[in-house]
């Protein structure tokens, strides 16, 4: 009985080992099948990728011999996309145009408010803004200090930092330019000269042909030089102011012209040989006084100093012809 038991036990162990081996073999077969399936799927993926690359190569070959571009490829421009781009560009241009029109209108309004508004000379944008800044600053200074708008300091504040043409325009519109200042100085000097100049007399004898230099008035005018106003006052102040012009002797005939030289002929008078004091009058540049008698030889230059020792020798009328012959024969 014991042997039989032992045999049955061994049989059970053998059966168990065979079933275990069968299970192990089946599990190995399943593992192999699972490994084979993803391999087949991977082969299919690689085949599709190779097919796509081949198609891309064919497209590049069709494009021609163009150089290959690196980076992302551009999208193809379709009609809808072109229309969208065009609409965006039109909107941007219209927006920029309206902005510039508004800016120009605002600057024009600002130019009209400025003290030097001119229709002919239009200020630039930067000059308009600088002038507006200076104008605001100058007005604030006027309110604080109480100075007038026509002073020199106001103009200096307006012209600070501006270009030369803009400064000239501001000064010209405010009538404080360099020309007006020069005119003011000239008026001051002329008033001083009129107050200091008194009567100036010198010997004038008979109106016959004077001695050399041949009676040519231009030769005397070449040596005339303008004199300072202080020296004029010193030279003219010593003469008596109660002298008067001589009485009118007779009508003068038109000047006789001989080859460019002018001489005056006067009708006969019993006082031809008489010497008398001749006194020229000086008229101011502003013509404030009335018109007085002046010498027939007037030049465009103002106020020349006539030499005091300028004297004329008297000649008889019968010697005039011989004198002229000797002059022009030389």
From Swiss-Prot:
Membrane spanning stretches: none
Posttranslational mods: Serine or threonine phosphorylation within the basic region may regulate neurogenic activity.
GO molecular function: DNA binding; protein dimerization activity
Entry keywords, A to Z: Activator, Developmental protein, Differentiation, DNA-binding, Neurogenesis, Nucleus, Phosphoprotein, Transcription, Transcription regulation
Composition bias type Basic residues, residue spans: 67-79
Alphabetical list of InterPro entries matching this protein: bHLH_dom (IPR011598), bHLH_transcription_factors (IPR050359), HLH_DNA-bd_sf (IPR036638), NeuroD_DUF (IPR022575), TF_bHLH_NeuroD (IPR016637)
Annotated compartments: Nucleus
GO cellular component, one term: nucleus
Classification via PROSITE patterns: BHLH (PS50888)
Chief site of localization: nucleus
Skewed-composition ranges (Acidic residues): 52-64
Acetylation keyword on record: no
One GO-annotated biological process of the protein: neuroblast proliferation
Disulfide bond positions: none
Region feature Disordered, mapped onto this chain: 23-80
Expressed in which tissues: Expressed in retinal interneurons amacrine cells (at protein level). Expressed in neurons of ventricular zone of the retina at postnatal day 1 (P1). Expressed transiently in amacrine and horizontal cells of the inner nuclear layer (INL) of the retina at P7 until P14.
Record text on subunit structure and interactions: Efficient DNA binding requires dimerization with another bHLH protein.
Its biological purpose: Probably acts as a transcriptional activator. Mediates neuronal differentiation. Required for the regulation of amacrine cell fate specification in the retina.
Protein name: Neurogenic differentiation factor 4
The organism of origin for this protein: Mus musculus (Mouse)
Phylogenetic classification of the source organism: Eukaryota, Metazoa, Chordata, Craniata, Vertebrata
Gene designation per UniProt: Neurod4
């Amino acid at each position: 009985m014991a042997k039989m038991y032992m045999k049955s036990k061994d049989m059970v162990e053998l059966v168990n080992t065979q079933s275990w081996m069968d299970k192990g073999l089946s599990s190995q077969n399943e593992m192999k099948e699972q490994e084979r399936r993803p391999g087949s799927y991977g082969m299919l993926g690689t085949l599709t990728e190779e097919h796509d690359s081949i198609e891309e190569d064919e497209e590049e070959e069709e494009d021609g011999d163009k150089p290959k571009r690196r980076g992302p490829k551009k999208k193809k421009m379709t009609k809808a996309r072109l229309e969208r781009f065009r609409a965006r560009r039109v909107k941007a241009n219209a927006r920029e145009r309206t902005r510039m029109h508004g800016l120009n209108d605002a600057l024009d309004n600002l130019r009209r408010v400025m003290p030097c508004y001119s229709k002919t000379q239009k200020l630039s944008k930067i000059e308009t803004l600088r002038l507006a800044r200076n104008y605001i600053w100058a007005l604030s200074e006027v309110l604080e200090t109480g100075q007038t708008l026509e002073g020199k300091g106001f103009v200096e504040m307006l012209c600070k930092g501006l270009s030369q043409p803009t400064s000239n325009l501001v000064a010209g519109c405010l009538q404080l330019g360099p020309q007006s200042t020069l005119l003011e100085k000239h008026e001051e000097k002329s008033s001083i000269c009129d107050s200091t100049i008194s009567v100036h007399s010198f010997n004038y004898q008979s109106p016959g042909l004077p001695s050399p230099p041949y009676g040519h008035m231009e030769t005397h005018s070449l040596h005339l030089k303008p004199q300072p106003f202080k020296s004029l006052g010193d030279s003219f102040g010593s003469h008596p102011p109660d002298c008067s012009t001589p009485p009118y002797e007779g009508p003068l005939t038109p000047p006789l012209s001989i080859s460019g030289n002018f001489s005056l002929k006067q009708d006969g008078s019993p006082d031809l040989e008489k010497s008398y004091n001749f006194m020229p009058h000086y008229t101011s540049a502003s013509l404030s006084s009335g018109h007085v008698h002046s010498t027939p030889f007037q030049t465009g230059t103002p106020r020349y100093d006539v030499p005091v020792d300028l004297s004329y020798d008297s000649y008889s009328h019968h010697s005039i012809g011989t004198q002229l012959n000797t002059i022009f024969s030389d």
